[in-house]
Regions:
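Short metal-coordination and nucleic-acid-contact micro-motifs, chiefly zinc-binding Cys/His arrays
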Residues: 63, 71-75
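Short, cysteine/histidine-rich loop/knuckle motifs that typically chelate Zn2+
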Residues: 77-83
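Short, non-ligating residues that shape and space the ligands of small metal-coordination modules
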Residues: 87-88
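Conserved His + Asp/Glu catalytic blocks
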Residues: 117-126, 134-216
Length: 216
């Protein structure tokens, strides 16, 4: 393997991400022990996750692949397991989306981001976001099934996505949002779509008009 090759650089970047995730998992384990000492065993499992990993270089494919390691499989607590789980999910959905786009050459992918107003209560904000999305999906289904209900979300043929939660370092408020990998017709005016979605999203949430439609 030549130094500076694409495979080597890709592997180094992967290890850098794993290192950051490992540090985060250790921090979570320490937090658990500090606040719930009785959960020491559970915290220790998270702390020891990915203490060793085995990689092999497959020269015929020109890639490094992880072939072994110790993992806790607690993706809700462990950043390392969450990272690997999300990577597998992306691979699975990428294949499905690729198949759909092959059979429907007239569609293009866009990244659709929907958010709600920040707040101090994560559970309340999450329920608020889920409720707005449920109404959005119901309106879209009605519009696409022939009902008179009009919604700009009817322009989305299909989507797959995930929730993300951030907390303001200064305000301490929770910022929940959802990222959707969506498929729309190639001739869709994305700027007009974003504007109309923003107005409709404001009516659904009653506290936010933050919508972003980005071509991929």
């Amino acid at each position: 393997l030549l130094a500076g090759s694409d495979a080597e650089q890709e592997h180094k970047e992967r290890l850098r991400k794993y290192s950051g995730a490992k540090k985060h998992s250790v921090a979570v384990a320490e937090y658990i022990v500090d606040h719930e000492p009785l959960l020491f065993k559970e915290a220790e499992v998270v702390r020891l996750c990915s203490n060793w990993l085995i990689f092999r270089y497959f020269y015929t494919a020109g890639k490094y692949r992880m072939i072994g390691g110790c993992t806790c499989k607690k993706h809700l607590l462990c950043a390392m397991c969450a990272l690997r789980r999300s990577a597998k999910t992306v691979m699975a959905y990428s294949a499905k989306i690729g198949h759909v786009m092959t059979e429907n050459p007239g569609v293009i992918p866009v990244l659709l981001t929907l958010t709600v107003k920040n707040g101090p209560d994560l559970e309340e904000r999450m329920q608020h976001l889920e409720s707005a999305i449920s109404r959005m999906i119901r309106n879209r289904s009605n519009a696409r099934s022939g009902c008179r209900h009009q919604t700009v979300f009817r322009l989305v043929h299909g989507a797959a996505g995930a929730f993300e939660f951030k907390r303001g370092s200064g305000s301490g408020l929770w910022h929940p949002h959802i990222h959707l990998y969506a498929l729309v017709d190639a001739e869709t005016d994305l700027m007009a779509m974003e504007w109309d979605m923003s107005e409709e999203w404001r009516k659904l949430t009653r506290d936010s008009h933050n919508v972003d439609v980005c071509p991929l």
